[in-house]
Amino acid sequence: MKNRGVKLAKKAFQLRPKRFSVVWMLPNFLTICALIFGLQAMYQALFGNWDNVIIMIIIASVFDMLDGRVARLLKSTSEFGMHLDSLSDFVVFGAVPALAVYLWMDKPQDNIFWIVIVLYVICSALRLARFNSELSERPSYAKNYFNGVPTPAAAFLMLFPLAIEGYLNEYMLKSFDIIGFWIVFISISMVSNLPTFSGKVFQVPKSLVIPMLIILALLSNAIISNPIKGFITLVLVYIISLPFASIFYLRLKKKA
């Protein structure tokens, strides 16, 4: 037991940052910003401020999207940063949305619903672990795709009913059966082999550059001017993209 503790200590020492330059710190600072906004979302959930929860998660997802890109741009990727990012993602996109939905449903004492909530958190952890283990194993044709729904997208899907209720005042969605099945669907989709668009190395054809810029501009404007409406639109666009991702992925796989 003592030897195991020594080995873990040595491993932690090896993973410590070798330098503290601005180049190294910036991506990790962005990751910590994502974690801060995720924790702020949790704080807002405790008081039932569901719109604020969604806005905090949106901001956290922006920082989460930037940290990896900045690290690659500055050539400052590290194992330390990868682990920090995974831990942050687990909290922000795994634990926080699960807690928010549980509180939104008025803390039901139903054991089955609690099991469903726990299932989502567990699948989030499994999804992140699988992603880290597959970083160097993906074939070239699959670089534009994720295996399963990523945790940030899963968090958006989890909070989708909260946004619908707040925007449309549709309380019929607040049903154990509907929300339970929705959470199970999201959980399974995270650990499935469903191909989903990555966007990390996605190249837009020249003929589609202007239409894509227009769509991005409209989405950005919608999110800024009306975050909840923009959030709903973004989630609907993502849901619509899922079958297209599978079609394009299978075509590339056949050609490979």
Give a label for each model feature.
Residues 69-78, 125-141, 191-199, 245-250:
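C-terminal ends of transmembrane helices
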